[in-house]
Structure formats: C-alpha cells, structure tokens
Curated annotation (Swiss-Prot):
It comes from Salmonella agona (strain SL483). NCBIfam families: gshA_cyan_rel, PRK13516.1. One of its GO terms (biological process) is modified amino acid biosynthetic process. This is Putative glutamate--cysteine ligase 2. HAMAP family: Glu_cys_ligase_2 (MF_01609). Belongs to the glutamate--cysteine ligase type 2 family. YbdK subfamily.
Length: 372
C-alpha cells in the first residue's frame, strides 16, 4: 500500500487530543454510555471535535489546527463546558487520568465502529485492555523530511514527557508501583514503542509499504508508535502522555512539545542516528516506573543523570522558543512542577495514603475536571 504524500502545514501549529474517562456515579466505575454523550454534544460544537475512541467508556476531545496554546485552550475549554453540561443531564461524570483505577477490562464494550471492530478482530482482548487514556499533541511541519528529523529529535525527550504527565499509578484495583502504568498496556502490540529507524521521508514511505504487507496496517492510524508522522495532517504526533487531571496541565504539556519542536527544527541540536535508540526503552521504562525520580543513561558515554535535572535542562533550552510562540507560561508552570518534585501520580498516591478510597479518588478526579 502506498503512503499518501506529506501534506504541507504551517510549522509549529498544533492540535491536541484528550482521551477522557466517562464515569458512572455513584459507584464511579467506567460507564458504557459515551455514544449517548457524544450524540448530545456534537450539535453544540463551534470548534474542534468530540468523538469515540476504542471503547464505550472513552470520549475524545480534539482541537482543530491552532496557532498557539491560547487558541487551543479556548477550544478545549468550550468543549469541556458542553461535555460537562451534557454529562450532568445524563447523570454521568467526566475525568482525566491515564487509567481508571479499578475498572475491569472484561466489561469494556468496543465501539460499534468499522475500524475498531476490525482492530478487535486483529488483537482480541488486547483492545479491551487498551481502555486507557492519553493526550496526543500534533505539531505542524513544512515537509516530510522535517517531520522525520523532528520525530527523531523529540524521541530524545520521550522520558521527560512521560514523567511530567504521569497519572496512572493504579490499575485493576491495585497500586502498580509505576508512575505511568498506562503505556505498559501496549507492550504486547507489535507496533509498541519507537518507530523503526528511517532517515528521511522516502525511507519512511518504504517502511510503511512493507508494514502494509502484514494486512494489519491500512493507514497511519493503525500504527501506535510513541511518536508518529501524520502525513494527512502534515504533523508529527507525540502520543506518550497520560491524560492530565486538569485542562491547564494538558495545555502546558502541549506548549512544551510545541516549543521543543521549534527549538529542534531551528537549532538542529542533534544529528539523528540509529544508535540513539539503543537505550530508548530502558530510559522510557525509568520514566514510566519512577517518574521524575527516574535515571537516564547516555547511550554514548554511559553517564547517568536524574530525569528531573535533565527535564530542567530541557525547559531552559526551549525557553527562547516558547517566548516566540507565546508558550512561556507553560514552561514556567512545568519548571515549577519539577522543582516541587511531583506529578499527578504522586498526588493520587497521597490521596490514598491519607485514607481515601479508589472510588473516592475517581470522584475527586471528576470534581477536579469540573473546576471544584
């Protein structure tokens, strides 16, 4: 199967996707009523899109093409308002977080959608287990070769993005001991982790053609790498973040990725090579397991450094780009988060340590999403 040409888009424009949990009070388990909610809100949208994800307990909010994080925030805030209003009318709750802490995957109903039903046929129970919730950020690129360079550049910072957004310590009623357990769900999929090595868009087209020979890949949407090019949109899409508990944190993460993309494409600080990825999964694991307390290992020198320290270095590097893009408030907020030493996974554990229950935790997450 041939790959579509890379659609030229304005560099550094962005789009944000948030996979939200649809909750059924008073037990605060996942609901199976996302279709009802989506049908209720679609006529009220003026910008962006609200749509299904894999199962009936998931709802995706997606912005249109945005020039900066302020425009993206306005679109997401408007969608948040209409979703919460409809959820209240249907006696449902909405919240963020990368996993629901006690749902059972066997109860999850795959959406009545041709693509998702085909995916269920290919992957079986793995699809129901993939009832987890992430944030994806698209960044515009001028051409396919820039997209491949940007993908490799951003891959250096996958651990940083994971650690800052980690919000999935609980799963199936247990503390997983991970800051981000969500990404472990995808480890059984054949397209888990980093994209196979290519050095330019022509090589990527060849890779896609070979992947299509498997008959499991019909489009880019069927590839679930940590970062992937999206030729139809003319973007690179970062897919490793847990859905945050607040809209503000989602905007901050998008601002960081946009600023990092600008820094990478204007400064070109790396010369990508295949060896860059030799320790990729080890460093990724450190971020998932320990969050900002993880330790990164340099593939070339063997030097080890705290992920928190390296994240502060990244934030300093991208600050000039953030100022040019109007994203400096996002960088300031994330810098403060790192210096305080926490993420949302840590907050969740503190809630439980203080005597809270998992049911109470989900209730609290719904309150946080409504601004209470």
């Amino acid at each position: 199967m041939a790959l579509n040409d890379f659609h030229v888009s304005e560099p550094y424009t962005l789009g944000i996707e948030l996979e939200m949990q649809v909750i059924n009070p008073p037990g605060y388990d996942l609901s199976q009523d996302s279709s009802t909610l989506i049908d209720a809100v679609k006529p009220q949208l003026t910008a962006g899109e609200i749509k299904h994800d894999i199962t009936e307990s998931m709802l995706e909010m997606a912005t249109g093409v945005c020039r900066d994080i302020d425009q993206a925030a306005a679109q997401l805030s408007a969608m948040q308002h209409v979703i919460l209003q409809a959820a209240s009318e249907h006696h449902l709750g909405i919240c963020g977080g990368g996993t629901h802490p006690f749902q059972k995957w066997q109860r999850q109903e795959v959406c009545d959608n041709e693509r998702y039903q085909r995916t269920l046929e290919n992957f079986g129970y793995l699809i129901q287990q993939a009832t987890v919730f992430g944030q994806h950020v698209h960044v515009g690129c001028a051409n396919g070769d820039d997209a491949i360079y940007l993908l490799h550049g951003l891959s250096h910072f996958v651990p940083h993005f994971i650690a800052l957004s980690a919000a999935s310590p609980y799963m199936q009623g247990s503390d997983t001991r991970f800051a981000c357990a969500r990404l472990n769900i995808f480890s059984a999929f054949p397209d888990n982790g980093p994209m196979p090595w290519v050095s330019n868009w022509q090589e990527f087209a060849g890779l896609f053609r070979r992947l299509s020979y498997t008959t499991m890949i019909d489009s880019i949407k069927d590839l679930h790498w940590d970062i992937r090019p999206s030729p139809a949109f003319g973007t690179v899409e970062v897919r490793v973040m847990d859905t945050p508990l607040t809209l503000d944190h989602a905007i901050n993460m998008a601002g960081l990725i946009q600023a990092t993309a600008h820094w990478l494409l204007t400064e070109r600080p790396f010369k990508p090579q295949e060896q860059d990825y030799l320790l990729y999964k080890f460093n990724r694991f450190q971020a998932c397991r320990y969050g900002l307390e993880g330790v990164l290992t340099d593939v070339y020198t063997g030097d080890r450094r705290r992920l928190a320290d390296d994240t502060l270095r990244l934030l300093d590097n991208v600050t000039p780009s953030a100022r040019k893009l109007g994203a400096d408030s996002a960088i300031d907020a994330l810098r403060l988060q790192v210096k305080k030493g926490g993420n949302e996974a840590q907050y969740m554990r503190e809630f439980i340590a203080d005597g809270g229950s998992l049911i109470g935790l989900v209730q609290k997450h719904c309150e946080i999403w409504t601004g209470q």
